[in-house]
Structures are given as C-alpha cells and as structure tokens.
C-alpha cells in the first residue's frame, strides 16, 4: 500500500471518522475474536461440571468484560490502559491451570485466585521501566514472531472445523474455509481505497452465508434467550487457597510477557515506532486489574488478543474510535443475549478461513522487526536460539516430563512464554561487546 493511501484518518490513532465508517471495522475485530473469547469459559465450565444455565450466563459476562477491558485499553483511566488499539478477551493461557484448580477446589477457588493474581499483576505493571529493560527491540521482535507462529495452529484448527470436533477435517469444513479465504483475497484485490481493509469482514459474511445454506449454522438457541439480561455480580462464592493463588500468579507473569509482545507488535506494526514505557505499563496494569474485575463477574482472566494484532498487521487500521465501536458491540452482546447468540453462531471453519492470512501477517511482521534490529551475531543468536527452543520444545511437550506439573502446565504448550524467557536471559548474559 502506498504512503498516499495511509493518509486516510482510518489509519491514524485519533483520526476523525464517522460512526458509519467506524462500525464495519469495529465489527470485523469482534468477529475475529468472538469465538476465542467465549471458548475458555466453556472448557473450564465443562471440567468443573457447571450447570448449562450458569455457563451460559458466564458467556454473556465474558462479552461484557471484554468490551469494558477494550474500552479501558483504548481510553486509559489514570495509569490503567495503554491508549492503543488493543482488543481484550478471555485468555486461553489460563485454561490449563484453571482446569487443575477447578477440579481441586471448585470454580470458587479459581475465582479467588484470579482476583488476587490480577491485583498482583496490576501492581507489578506499574514498574514499567523494569519491564522495558528486559525487552529491547530484538527481544520484542523475537516474541512477536513467536506469537505469529503460535497462532498458525489455531487458524488451522479452526479451518478444519474446530478443536475437539469429532468430524474435524471433513469436506464441508474445508470447503467453507476455502471459500472464506478466497473471498478475503478476492475482496482485497478488487476493492479500492480503505475498503480493502474490510476483506476479513467480507470473507466472514460470505463464509457465514455459505455455511448457513450448508446447514452448519445453529440458530435454535435464538428463540430461547431473553431480550435483555444483566450479568450477575459475584455469581460464585470465592475461596482463597495459597497454592492456587501462587499458581495463577505465575501464569499472570506469563500472560504479562504475551501482553508486552502484543503491545510491542501493535506499535511497531500499526504505528511504525517503538513502544513507550507508559504503554507497556498501562497494558499490563489493565490486564491485571480488569482480570480482577472479570472474576467479580465469574469470568477467567482477560488479556490482549494476538488475533487482533494480526488483523491490524494485515489492515494497518489503528483508529481508536473504530475499535471502540467494536467494544461497544461486545458490551451490547453482554446485555442483549440474542446478539451474543447470533455472533456465537459463526462456524469455526469460517473463522479459520479468515485467520490464516491474519496470523501469517504477524510472522512476517516479526521477521521484519528482527531485520530492523540488524543481523549482527548477538541478535542472530538471541532470535534463532529463542525461537528454536521455544517453538521446538513446545512442539515436543514430552521434553518437559522431568519438571513439576506446575512448570509443565505453564510452559509445555506455551511457546510465547518460553521464547520470551530464553530471549530475555540471552539478552542479559550475552556481552554487548560482541555486537558488530
């Protein structure tokens, strides 16, 4: 895309655009993350054998909290929030440990640990200058690249019909995913001006219509929901267990590294500059405190969504007002269950067709960031070793078998966390005198 095309206000953080122009871009962001936002709740609810009506209410709360968190990231309150176009949602990072704690203490034990762990992360986030020292550009670039690689399997799983689907890979899913992907590409080729950046929304609509006529869209629950429903505060009695709190706090630290990576990627890819200390601090504080708020509504921790970083990497649309309309749609979905049911009916294969290209864009952007850091021997060592260990080891999780369950739960399948730690350690121990 030429520099001339970037002059449209939609590509500016605070560009003035109309509501009618903003809504399609906001809706595109919400559709890109909607299924991933509610899936963690459903997984953990199944493990703790939560009644269907309760898990349904939590799905509604998840949408409300994600919308509130996104608004705070966009428009900070005091030092809470980054001021960047970061979309928030319920994090998959905590699913494994939530299942373990939930099976041991029940869902109330999970909520107590989320409340305390979120407050601790929020407090640590205030020390941005210490985080900044740990993440020079080469570390941030390596983490961004790993985020892209970690999401490729997510896109592929959705393309085939969704994780755990007994009919995974069947022809209907592949057909719908392919039609969606081709629609995205075709729209991007033939559309003009900033309308090109709505290719994901166009693909989602085309894929949804095709999936509907193929019998893949379930609308049966639409007739059963209330018109308006206010999410319940404190739906579970919280319990506070030291081991559960400690376990969640460790995962909150891992989540913070992912947030740092997402925030760094957002500024590098979307705003074409380095991330600022106050942006890192605001992102982490928002992650922590909004996660604590999430527990009050009975939901799991909330964090920045890499899927939406991928969307910005592909479209370069960073306008905060446009993303804000998406946050408002999420809040409305939390208050009007029918809207939530409609959005949740989006088939996984449709989502997969759109996200494949988005997630690949993060990988390419990360590689570009590494190139901008320079290919001296120190940077090459940090990037290559961190990516090799982080991606390689997590693709072979049995290599973690000698470690305690807590370590395995945190790192065995989380390549972003492993990449961050390895890159951070190498940055500390490798002498800067080796730079060429």
Describe every region a protein language model picked out.
Residues 19, 45-81, 249-320:
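Membrane-embedded helical hairpins/re-entrant loop segments and their flanking transmembrane helices
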Residues 1-25, 220-233, 268-275, 279-283, ...:
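Intrinsically disordered, low-complexity non-transmembrane regions of multi-pass membrane transporters
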Residues 1-85, 93-101:
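N-terminal signal-anchor module of multipass membrane proteins
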Residues 57-58, 79-92, 133-142, 195-201, ...:
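Short, non-helical or kinked segments that cap or interrupt transmembrane helices
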């Amino acid at each position: 895309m030429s520099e001339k095309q970037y002059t449209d206000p939609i590509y500016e953080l605070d560009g003035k655009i109309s509501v009618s122009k903003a809504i399609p871009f906001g809706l595109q962001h919400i559709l890109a993350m909607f299924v991933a936002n509610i899936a963690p709740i459903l997984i953990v609810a199944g493990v703790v054998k939560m009644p269907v009506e309760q898990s349904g209410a939590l799905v509604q709360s998840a949408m409300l909290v994600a919308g509130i968190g996104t608004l705070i990231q966009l428009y900070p309150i005091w030092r809470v929030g980054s001021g960047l176009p970061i979309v928030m949602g319920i994090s998959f990072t905590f699913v494994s440990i939530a299942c373990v704690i939930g099976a041991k203490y029940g869902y109330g034990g999970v909520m107590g640990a989320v409340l305390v762990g979120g407050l601790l992360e929020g407090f640590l986030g205030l020390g941005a200058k210490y985080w900044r020292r740990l993440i020079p550009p080469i570390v941030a670039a390596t983490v961004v690249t790993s985020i892209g690689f970690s999401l490729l399997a997510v896109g592929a799983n959705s393309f085939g019909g969704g994780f755990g689907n007994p009919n995974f890979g069947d022809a209907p899913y592949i057909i719908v995913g392919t039609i969606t992907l081709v629609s995205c590409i075709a729209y991007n080729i033939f559309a003009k001006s900033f309308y090109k950046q709505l290719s994901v929304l166009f693909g989602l609509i085309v894929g949804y219509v095709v999936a509907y006529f193929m019998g893949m869209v379930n609308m049966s629950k639409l007739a059963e929901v209330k018109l308006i429903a206010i999410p319940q505060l404190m739906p579970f009695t919280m319990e506070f267990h030291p081991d559960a709190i400690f376990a969640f706090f460790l995962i909150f630290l891992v989540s913070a590294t992912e947030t740092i990576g997402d925030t760094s990627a957002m500024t590098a890819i979307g705003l074409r500059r380095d991330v600022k200390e106050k942006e890192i601090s605001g992102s982490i504080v928002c992650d922590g405190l909004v996660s604590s708020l999430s527990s009050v509504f009975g939901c799991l921790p909330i964090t920045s969504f890499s899927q939406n970083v991928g969307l910005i990497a592909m479209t370069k649309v960073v306008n905060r007002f446009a993303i804000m309309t998406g946050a408002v749609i999420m809040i409305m979905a939390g208050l009007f269950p029918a809207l939530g049911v409609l959005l949740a009916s989006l088939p996984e294969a449709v989502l997969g067709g759109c996200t494949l290209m988005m997630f690949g864009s993060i990988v390419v952007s990360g590689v570009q960031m590494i190139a901008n850091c320079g290919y001296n021997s120190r940077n090459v060592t940090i990037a290559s070793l961190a990516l090799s260990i982080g991606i390689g080891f997590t693709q072979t999780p049995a290599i973690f078998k000698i470690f305690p369950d807590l370590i395995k739960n945190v790192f065995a399948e989380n390549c972003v966390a492993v990449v961050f730690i390895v890159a951070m350690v190498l940055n500390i121990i490798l002498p800067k005198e080796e730079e060429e």
